[in-house]
Amino acid sequence: MKRLLLALALLVPLAASADEGMWMIHALNQALEKKMQERGLQLSAGEIYNADAPGATVSDAVVSLGFYCTASVISDEGLLITNHHCAYSDLFDLSTPEKNYLEDGYWAFFRQDEIPLQGKEVYFLKRVLDVTDEVAAVADSLTARGERFGSRKLTSILERRYAARTGLEASLNSMWAGEKYYLALYSTYKDIRLVGAPPVSIAAFGGDEDNWEWPQHKGDFALYRIYDHGEPLHSPWHLRISRAGYREGDYAMVVGYPGRTDRYSSSYKVDYLTRVERPVTNRLRGNQMEIVRKWMDADPAVRAKYSDWFFSLSNVQEMQEGEVQCVKRFGVVDEKRAQEKDLPQDILQGLADEYAAIEDIEREKAYYRETIVRGMRITPTMLRMSNAKTPEARDEIYRRDIGALDARVEKDLIAYSLEEYFGHMPADVVGPRQDSLRKAFSGDWKAMAEHLWDNPLVLMDFITEVKITAFNEREKHTGDLTDLQHRYTRALYHDREAKGIVQYPDANSTMRLTYGVVSSLEPWDAVYTSWYSSPRGLREKYNPAQHDFALPADFVAALDRYDGPVNFLTDNDITGGNSGSPVLNARGEVIGLAFDGNKESLASDVSFTPDYNKCVCVDIRYVLWILEDYVGLERIVKELK
C-alpha cells in the first residue's frame, strides 16, 4: 500500500495539489511545520512528536502491529482500532466450522468475551536517536581489532547496548544505504485481545474486484485491546474521534508505519523489474488465483481453508500488475534516467551491465520461486518434513498440516506448477529424480500431480531436489549488484543534497508522517470521481449471488438508517504497512482509517505521481454507525465518548 528543511520534495516536482513525502516523525522541523500549517494544520510539530513529553502527543497514541500494520489507541482503556484486513489472519485462525468469525464477524459484548491472541505484539515509539557517529565508531573499533563484521553484527551490538541502557526494545535502521543510522526505542505489549470485527462481506465489500479501485465501499476496521498484567492498559493519552466530518480540500494527515518503498532505485532496476521479473510472477500468480478461486466459488469448505492464502496472493499480484502498468503509463524509467544523469558514470554503467547479465538467471529463478516454492500451498509442509530429525516427527508434521489443505485444490496447483516449472527450467537446475518423473509421465501433469499427492515422501524429495547450486554458480559471474545499488543510493543522496533538494528516506517500517488534503480523483482525461462514496454505492453493487458483493440481509435493511460517507480519498503518501493508520484532521482527531491505494498510484513504491496518488480511507462515522446502530455495541460506543 504510501519534507524536512525545505518545502519541495525530491523525486518529482510537486503539483500544488499533492504533498509527497513519508517524513520521519522525529525530524519534524519549523519549515515542515510551516508547510503543514499552510495546508491547514492547527497543531505544532511538538504536539505531533515530542520524546521529552511522553504521553502527550499524537505519535504516542499510534502503534505498530508487529511491523506489518498500524493501529491507534482510541480510549483510555487501551482500545485499538485498525483495519479488518490487518486482523484477517487472526479471524481466520480463530474460526471453526461452527464459529466462522471471518464470515459472521465477532463482537465482544462483554469484557470477558475479548479473545486473547497468541504471538501478537504492539509497539509504542518512545524516542528516535541519531546514532550515525556511534555506528561508525563501533565499525572502526571492530576493524582495529581485526574482526570481520557486517550490518547484522553492527545492528546487534547497537540494539543490545541500547536495550540494556533503557529497558526498551531497540531497533537500528539504516537510511539512504548507510548514510544515516537511527535507533528507535519502543515499549512493547504482548497481551492483545480481539474486541470486534464485522463480517468480511461488510469489511471487504467488493473483494478482489474492487481492490485498488475507486470508488470503494468497505467497512475495513477491527478492534483490539491492549492488556497489561491482566488488566486493560490505562492510556490517558489517546486519539479523539471526530464526528464533524470534512470537506474536499480539508487538511488530512496520516501517521503510521509504512513498510517498504524503493524510491532511490535506479532506472535500470525499475526497467528490469517491470520488463523481466514482474511479467513472470504476475502471470503465474494470476493463474494460481484462478485455480483457487474456482474451487472457493464451488465449495464453502475450500473458501474457509484458502481465503487467507488467497487474500495475500491476490493483494500482491494485483499490486505488482498495477505497478507495471503505472511505470509504463507515467514514464517512470525515463523520469529516473533524467534524475540520475549527473551521477558517476562508473556506477551507472556497472548497473547497466549487471542487470543485463542477470536477466536470464533471474527469469528462471522467478519461475522456480513461483512454482515450486510459492505456487503450491503444501510446499512449507514438505520443507518442514525434510528438516524433521526423525521419521516420527516428519509424519506428525504431515498429519498436523494436511487437514488445512484440500486435495482437489492442491493437485490442480501442483499440476500447474509442474507444467510451468518443466517448461522453463534449464537442464542443470532440474534434479535427476525430477527428470525421471517428468519422463515417466510424458507431460501428463495431472497424472504426475496425482502421483506426487498420493506419495508425500516422493513429493517432499521432488520439492527439495532443485539444484540451487546451479543458480549460484552462474550468479558468481555477475558481480556485486547489491554494492552497486548501495553506491547508487548514496550518490543520489549526495547529488540531491548538493542541489538543495529536501529528502526523506525510503520507508522501512519506522514511524512516518504524511500530510495533504481530502481530494477527488481524475484518473483519465474528462473522467472525474468524487472524494467520497456513499451507501448508495453499496446498494448499487449489492449482489447476493456473488460472494464479493453479498451482504447480510439485516445490514442491507439497516443501510436506510445511514446517509453519511462510507469511504473517502486523500492525497496522503502511503504504502503497505500504513494499513490501519489513523487519518487525522487539522486538530489531530480521527476522521478515518487508511486501508488502500488507488490503481493509478501503484508505481508509488518507486515513484510518487502527483495528482494520481491517493489514499483510500474508511470514514470513522461509518465505523461508529456500524458499532452503534447495526451491531448495538453500546459499551464500546460509550467508551469512545
Where does each model-flagged region fall?
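Sec-dependent N-terminal signal peptides
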Residues: 4-13
